[in-house]
Amino acid sequence: RCLSMNAVRSNSVDFFLGTTTPAGFKGYFEPLRREPGMQMYLIKSGPGCGKSTLMKRLAVKAEQKGEPIQRIHCASDPDSLDGVIFLDKRAAIVDATAPHVMEPDAPGAEEQVVSLYHTLDADALHAHADEVKRLFAQNTALRSRAARYIASAGSLLLDSRRAEACSANFEKVRRYVKRLCARTLPRLPEGASASEELRLLSAITPKGPVFYRGTVQALADRYVVFHDDYGAVSRLLLELIRAEALARGYHIITCPCAMHPDDKIDHLFIPALRLAFLTDNRWHPVQLPGVQAVRCTRFVDRENLAGYRARLRFNERAAAELLEQAADLMAQAKACHDELETYYRAAVDFGKVDEAAAQCAGMLGLA
């Protein structure tokens, strides 16, 4: 069961920038830093010290001015923000603490640290040092257990992908992509420079898999949806479409698969054409009106694939149970984190946090 977040605001979209994968935490904060001309503001402070609230305020201010933004949600708690990207300003403010620690490469030049540590009363925290340390350790242990379940699910899903790959006609996929791109991606004027943003459209969270369908509706009016239960065909389709879009000079938003981010793309946006190529499966059902649906079984020898039926069914059932268990452990870790926040919140001077928020608004031209 996948939660889809539906709020459609064309000037404000939602993504993740990191998630727990079978290989551990995978973040795209560094590629964001390397996007051309991106000015980074790196927030440092403890849990419950107002980082997310500060960023939410800045996001609202930008929205009120009609500025396009991307809200970056935290996969451990999707109601909380890990960052806000201000597209017109080429600026981003992000939570630069674990598990996505960032330090400035060029302090002051392209990055500024926004420290909120001065808002903490260390003496008040020190009185609860043992309890705070215990909760940090417990949170880490629960997240590690969740990661192991995600890793197990990942290996089963990879096994299914390999089974489908044994039955797929990849030459047919290549010919199809050539025709599709000729039809949907008009050639741009000579010298158009291609660029790419990496974002996650879905993630495994304490609420289960979350998919930001509202972002799709905000960024595109035309949808080509590849229905692929196992991922081998859609993986090649998206890889080839990405290469073709970049070769033709388009700016694209590439959304890696949250389970196998290093070798599989799930979705791709071409904002200039308001066009999206999407993968639809049980983990993130697309369910949008007026889509051009492509069933990936057309590229597969179904008779051959039928020989794997029992194995594929087992993998799907077992992976679903493992991911359910992972979400449950993540929910326990979040409850632990919430308890940790109560200690920090009691030790924070929120007047000073408000001052820092006003300073940030000034730096970003949102005052």
Name what the model sees in each region.
Residues 5-32, 171, 175, 179-216:
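N-terminal pre-Walker A segment at the start of P-loop NTPase domains
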Residues 7-24, 60-124, 131, 245-324:
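Conserved nucleotide-sensing/catalytic segment adjacent to the nucleotide-binding pocket
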Residues 131-183, 314, 318-363:
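An accessory alpha-helical subdomain
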